[in-house]
């Protein structure tokens, strides 16, 4: 054995408090879109979701699917093309516009009456609605409950000090017999300040354990050449399924 860690023996890093005071403002996230600093976007979609999607959907149609901090995630069109209703929230209007443009979807925009100064973008087909606002303002819009949440790049982007508020927001959107698919990253948080932030299993239990059954479905090596600039040499991604207790 050469000592290389595999996707099945990932350790939890003990120094989980080192990132707790890290803060990125909404304006800084918007600047990332304006300046093209969106390496977190996956042009081909998320491979773990693609692998498990049909198993999760079980042939159902007409589900309501929520994408927190959606950006221009191509997976939104995957669900819409399968007959589901997609709702996303994203602070960057540019990111939302790029989604519709890159997916060749016509759309309209209208003000969100409950949140002055914000807009919702709706596909002409009517099954994709993307709200351009802070996720913490979203419950004011009465958008209803969801059958499924796809959380990739959301919890790991939320400032650590806001995670409890974020989890409570997610709980307010969950319908009966929900499936909450959650991706988190595992790396040494003493070497990279984030975002994306390190979210250990214990944190998921703390945030969601009282209401959800929590199961880790898969762990994969997600390290890429660009991650060397973070000062790390190891990065794993974990896919969790959260269901109603």
Curated annotation (Swiss-Prot):
Keyword line: Acetylation, Cytoplasm, Methyltransferase, Phosphoprotein, S-adenosyl-L-methionine, Transferase
Gene Ontology MF, one: thiopurine S-methyltransferase activity
Positions with a binding annotation for substrate: 40
Binding residues annotated for S-adenosyl-L-methionine, in chain numbering: 29-40, 69, 90, 134-135, 152
Principal cellular location given in the protein's record: cytoplasm
Known catalytic reactions: S-adenosyl-L-methionine + a thiopurine = S-adenosyl-L-homocysteine + a thiopurine S-methylether; mercaptopurine + S-adenosyl-L-methionine = 6-methylthiopurine + S-adenosyl-L-homocysteine + H(+); 6-thioguanine + S-adenosyl-L-methionine = 6-methylthioguanine + S-adenosyl-L-homocysteine + H(+)
UniProt enzyme class: transferase
GO biological process terms, semicolon-separated: methylation; nucleobase-containing compound metabolic process; xenobiotic catabolic process; xenobiotic metabolic process
Matching PANTHER family: THIOPURINE S-METHYLTRANSFERASE
Function: Catalyzes the S-methylation of thiopurine drugs such as 6-mercaptopurine (also called mercaptopurine, 6-MP or its brand name Purinethol) and 6-thioguanine (also called tioguanine or 6-TG) using S-adenosyl-L-methionine as the methyl donor. TPMT activity modulates the cytotoxic effects of thiopurine prodrugs. A natural substrate for this enzyme has yet to be identified.
Name this protein carries in UniProt: Thiopurine S-methyltransferase
Species annotation: Homo sapiens
Gene name in the database record: TPMT
